[in-house]
Amino acid sequence: GKQIRFAECGGHFALSLDGVGEGFAESKQPHTLEFKTMNDKNFKAMKNLGCKKSKPVYWAQCQIGMHLGDMDRCYFFAVNKNTDEMYGERIKRDRAVGNLLVSKAKNIIFSDTPPAKLNEDPSYWQCRFCSYFAVCHGCKVPEVSCRTCSHVTPEQDGTWSCAKGKPVVTCDEHLFIPQIMPKDFVVTDAGDTFVEYEDQDSGEIIRNENNSQAIFDGRMQNG
């Protein structure tokens, strides 16, 4: 009844399989199992195009599961939430893609700076539908968390360390990583405990020093 969990990068990156299946007519080898429900529109696209073309994110998830579980096939099963119609598809492992996706995750996790934008053009279709559009292309500030703080480092053993010696929880000494701030925020001064920005849109000088939540209240992505 429980999912099967695999982890990489010391535990910073993990994926849970819905199960492992055996006894398929097409192959006796074990398959990772991935179960999804979807609305009628997405389900019809899945039937017509298959998982890779209609839901590439799901397909990538299947590839990561096969990579971490060291299995060569995945059985992807979907249910139409509107009609209860079912769809099943056997997905073949692509070793190169699996390696690439896990390596990409590792690079992002242990990088000192966030990855580059998918596209510099805010009208690019994938950017417009991204949940972080307001941060990458707009004027919103990301949420306050240890992951967005300059003082915190993810360690290779799966732990987190804080340069301020704090427990790894959101605290009153949070300092945003400058590279994740809105594009109109230009750094004008910085030190070990602060970063000062000029908002190019309004001309306002904003000093991020302690208590980011209070300083940027109202500018947050979720605000």
Language-model-derived ranges and their functions:
Residues 1-12, 18:
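A short acidic/basic microdomain associated with nuclease active sites
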Residues 7-8, 23-25, 80, 199:
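Acidic surface patches and DE-rich sequence motifs
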Residues 45-59, 64-159, 170-222:
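Metal-dependent nuclease catalytic regions and adjoining charged, substrate-binding loops involved
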